[in-house]
Amino acid sequence: MAEEHDNRNLPWVEKYRPNKLEELISHADILSTIDRFIKEDRLPHLLFYGPPGTGKTSTILAVAKQLYSPKEFNSMVLELNASDDRGIGIVRGPVLSFASTRTIFKSGFKIVILDEADAMTNDAQNALRRVIEKFTENTRFCLICNYLSKIIPAIQSRCTRFRFGPLDNQQMVPRLEHVIQQERVDVTEDGMNALVTLANGDMRKSLNILQSTSMAYDVVNEVNVYTCVGHPLKEDISNIVNWMLNEDFTTAYNNILDLKTLKGLALQDILTEVHKFIHKVELPTKVRIKLLDKMAEIEYNLTAGTNEKIQLGSLIAAFQVTRDMIVMEAS
């Protein structure tokens, strides 16, 4: 009964995390290769890389659960998030002491899982390289990261690398439908499309959005999903572009500022959606290039932490210049 209660309070990303390799919904080629390694008892050191929410951690945890019973799991598997402690201490401390000891009741190797390994310093990675070399006989390492370029070549060459790409819609929808059925959530068709669109290939993100929207609203539809995550709706973007192109600067600025405040929108999200909108509209090539170049500059400024109101003014100005260029070309 207690376990059932615990399960009910779990975040859905953990509650529905796959426990076996066959339960994973994507990357069949990677899974079949790893399954063959396990069956032939030839599991190498592994390096999983790719964007978040694509099944990297779930895959190695499913491998560990396949290799060890629940009783053995804690003594045979060390799971660390490298971004908690990025320095050399994590390698010389918990990793070294775990890798260097043998267990008495289980033959074979232990597994060390280092999540977010790309956050480790170069010194820590060099120390890890030596530990990997020294304890290969009784320990296998699995490094998980988003950016392969941040892992030193010496570690890359000692691991078998697998890239986990973003999931496509056909893979995400059945898994979402399974969770929706289990949790008895009322989801509309446009709500499902919104979940998949906003997740952008990230299964974890789609489940988190689904759970938070279902807790905030009785029905998970497009408007409620976008409102819950504070993302602009299509009609909002249509209005914003319309104001920027057809109203004077002050009116457009005040209208967009009011909408941002009312719905709690971030300029970064507005910029992303406006960018998609621009590619669907007929514009002269020269005009489109100039506008996209200016939008890229604004996005760069936003990532540097500049004032949103100033960048909003810059965005509106870019569109007003675009309008004048279109008028000049037409005449």
Predicted regions and their residues:
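Helix-rich C-terminal "collar"/helical-bundle subdomain used as an assembly and partner-interaction module
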Residues: 239-331
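Conserved beta/loop motifs at nucleotide-recognition and modification sites
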Residues: 232
